[in-house]
Amino acid sequence: MSDKTNDDKTLSVNPKKTLTLKRPGVEQSTVRQNFSHGRTKAVVVETKKRKFSRPDEKPEVEAAAAPKPAAPAAAPQQAPASAPVSASAAQASAPQPAPVKAPATKAPAAPSAPVTKPHVAQQRPVHQRPGGQQAQRPRPADRSGMVLNTLSRSEMDARRRALEEAQIREVEERARAVEEAKRRAEEDARRAKEHEESARRQAEEEARLKAEAEARRKAEEEAAKRMPQPEARSERRDDARPAPYGARPQQAGRPQGGRPQPAGRPQQGSPRPAPIIADAAPIAGKPLPQSQLRKPGQSDDDDDRRSGAARRGVAAKPEVRAPKVVKGEDDRRRGKLTLTSNLEEEGRSRSLSAMRRRQEKFKRSQMQETREKISREVTIPETITLQELAQRMAERSVDIIKYLMKQGQMMKPGDVIDADTAQLIAEEFGHTVKRVAESDVEEGIFDVADNESAMVSRPPVVTIMGHVDHGKTSLLDAIRHANVVSGEAGGITQHIGAYQVVQNGQKITFIDTPGHAAFTAMRARGAQATDIAILVVAADDSVMPQTIESINHAKAAGVPIIVAINKIDKPAADPQKVRTALLQHEVFVESMGGEVLDVEVSAKNKINLDKLLDAVLLQAEMLDLKADPDRTAEGVVIEAQLDRGRGSVATVLIQKGTLHPGDILVAGSEWGRVRALVNDRGEHVKEAGPAMPVEILGLQGTPQAGDRFAVVANEAKAREIAEYRQRLARDKAVARQSGARGSLEQMMNQLQVSGTKEFPLVIKGDVQGSIEAITNALDKLGTDEVRARIVHSGAGGITESDVSLAEASNAAIIGFNVRANKQARDSAEQQGIEIRYYNIIYDLIDDVKAAMSGLLSPERRETFLGNAEILEVFNITKVGKVAGCRVTEGKVERGAGVRLIRDNVVIHEGKLKTLKRFKDEVAEVPSGQECGMAFENYDDIRAGDVIEAFRVEHVSRTL
């Protein structure tokens, strides 16, 4: 159907094409793809226009099955001429996927260039005919149109995720761009501020230099007025006067959009610097840089060529430098200090303090003032370093070293000098000296004078001494009315006990000792803790070796003795025999015409215990024992141990003053604050007066038995004293170890004094009869060189006191049918004491015999091998002298001992170095054969000498 219009245009409708609506924002074009074997395919290409939206908006979803509108005649899209109508219709009716937002790149509205794929025909525009029909090329019969497959849901999701990630990245990039712009703005502001500060400082520097130049000019004018000179010379000097140094042009700023102007180039409008004369003197107060200093022998040409300095009379060009980064106020003190930066022209200026010191020094030099010498009192210890001495004298260590160099001693500030040298140096420098010693820290601690008006009577301190098993602890148990023995393992005293009893309203302090070893240690440390010694002697056993030792210890300590004759209840008791035996050791009892009190007692039946206590009080009254309870406490350590629950526990005896909880005391090389005071009954007390034994808790370490203690003012003093004593103990230990090696003379003297070697033993058995048998057998093993010494023997198990006694005597412990308790085993393992157990007496005797044999020096046996006569002596290079010998008797072995005999006199004894026969090293040479011999480290051999060969063997000796 067709109609005609007035302008003769025909309106027509194509019956083969469906009327569709045009999708907005979509342009179509068809591309034909060629494949192998002549196959082709038409592909419809849609170009979508991107719709910009905000990030928070959701994409609009178009209808999937919307019909595609027909392309109008005026549309700019392109389609191939051979595209069939059916294909276009099918493509238009196909469902379209929902549009998704494209990336931020804007797509072109229509392709402006042809497709460049190979074998693809050039696209041509579609021309409309007057009748409205589109001109189409005839389609080949074997070609058919195909429609592209739609995207699956997973592909759509992947594409959507990619686009969302791209949007997120876009937002992040936009934020980063904003931050970068902000940072750049701040950096520009900072640089502008730095530039302003640099310009201000440069202006101040120029003003200062200008003022200095003006002042110098005025000074020169004044000097010229005072010293008249010829006019021509004055004019010449005025012409040659250099411009102020450092009057450089101002540093150019950083222009925007242009290249920065060099710092050394003068700006426009600024005054040019005056010419600088090369030979002009540098400005006072600011020396020339090193680059402008002329070296010896350097000419003007070298200056012009190398350093760029101006020739004489010619203005020097200012040096062009690279723009320098100016640091801000915060960065001024940061940066690396190098030689280049330090030697630049604009060097580091002096500080205000340095300028002030320089001005004061200049004024003093002008006025010729001398600084007064301040005399100080210098405290000089036993040793001091030069640096510390200089600090105490307020002198420079360099001056002290110079003085020592003049005296011929090359020393360093860290060298240590003695007190005499330090005193000479201090007096030479005009100071007074106060000599002190390290031991001065202990001054004022002990032996402080007591207040006689405050002296009161104190209880006596009594020590019970005597032989083992004579009843010392049983006697003390009977006096205390407490069963102490039953609480001890095996009935043997394990520790030193200190107790206090009351008799007739008066207190008596008793100290029980397990043997003489502990009392010896206390006496050796100077502990005069005992006022009265009770010598316990068994009436049935009389005087024994340890009884004699106890008598000697008491006499050495200057302690009065009271003899207690114990066990008088036994049938075999003979007290008179005891008194007679004591006469041999200069102990004269009253019944024998002496002054020593004696009391017959029985600890088991508690007989005459009151008489013994009365004798003690009588002796104490004769001694008139007094003490000052109001002064600081002093005393002695009776025993000390490390308790698992309470820490370091020390049993002490207060001798002077009163001890309170909270006091700070020093005991030997240990110190601490008293946390608690416990008496002998286990009760906590508030104070401990003179002659009162207490346990102290709170020490930092465990002191030694016999150490003296004293209360000090503060912890610093206590720590100083403890450190000094620890250092002194270390020095003594080192000296003891170095002296133990000693010289041969000391070793011979020690052998001469000690005499025979002793093998100390502590023997414990099940019954007394076994112990006596073992003791008798060991006594028979002794010789003139070695013998067994029984330190202690007794019936019962091995206790901790036995281990302590063995440790003090360096003895071994032997147990016969007995065992050690756990405390004794732990103590022995800790102290390294060996404990051996035996059940057969013969095994015990054999082991002791073998151990004692080890103390015997081995026997040296010498076996004669043979003689050789030297026939001729050869001097061989790199070997020395070699003796050509003939063996005349026996044989000669390599490595054997030899003696060189000349005129029947032995002149050398040594070993053979080589033994050869016909240039071959041999082990031995028999009699009648010739050989060559060389000695070790000896060459004085002559023809006719006789060489005697022998073998030495060391044979161990047995008892």
Curated annotation (Swiss-Prot):
Q: Where in the cell is it found?
A: Cytoplasm
Where does the record place the region G1?
Answer: 466-473
Give residue spans, biased composition: Polar residues: 27-37
Q: Which InterPro entries match?
A: EF-G-like_DII, EFTu-like_2, IF2_assoc_dom_bac, IF2_II, IF2_N, P-loop_NTPase, Small_GTP-bd, T_Tr_GTP-bd_dom
User: SUPFAM superfamilies annotated for this entry?
Assistant: Initiation factor IF2/eIF5b, domain 3 (SSF52156), P-loop containing nucleoside triphosphate hydrolases (SSF52540), Translation proteins (SSF50447)
Q: What is its main location?
A: cytoplasm
Extract the Pfam families matched here: EF-G_D2 (PF22042), GTP_EFTU (PF00009), GTP_EFTU_D2 (PF03144), IF-2 (PF11987), IF2_assoc (PF08364), IF2_N (PF04760)
- In this chain, composition skew of type Low complexity spans 63-118, 128-138, 246-284
State the GO CC annotations: cytosol
Q: Where is the tr-type G domain?
A: 457-626
Region (G2) residue ranges read 491-495
Q: One MF term in GO for this entry?
A: GTP binding
Alphabetically list the UniProt keywords: Cytoplasm, GTP-binding, Initiation factor, Nucleotide-binding, Protein biosynthesis
**Which residue ranges are recorded for the region named Disordered?**
1-374
Q: Where is composition skewed (Basic and acidic residues) in this entry?
A: 1-10, 154-225, 232-241, 318-333
* Purpose: One of the essential components for the initiation of protein synthesis. Protects formylmethionyl-tRNA from spontaneous hydrolysis and promotes its binding to the 30S ribosomal subunits. Also involved in the hydrolysis of GTP during the formation of the 70S ribosomal complex.
Which family is annotated? Belongs to the TRAFAC class translation factor GTPase superfamily. Classic translation factor GTPase family. IF-2 subfamily.
Name of the protein in its database record: Translation initiation factor IF-2
Species in which this protein is naturally found:
Brucella melitensis biotype 1 (strain ATCC 23456 / CCUG 17765 / NCTC 10094 / 16M)
What is this organism's lineage?
Bacteria, Pseudomonadati, Pseudomonadota, Alphaproteobacteria, Hyphomicrobiales
Q: Gene behind this chain?
A: infB
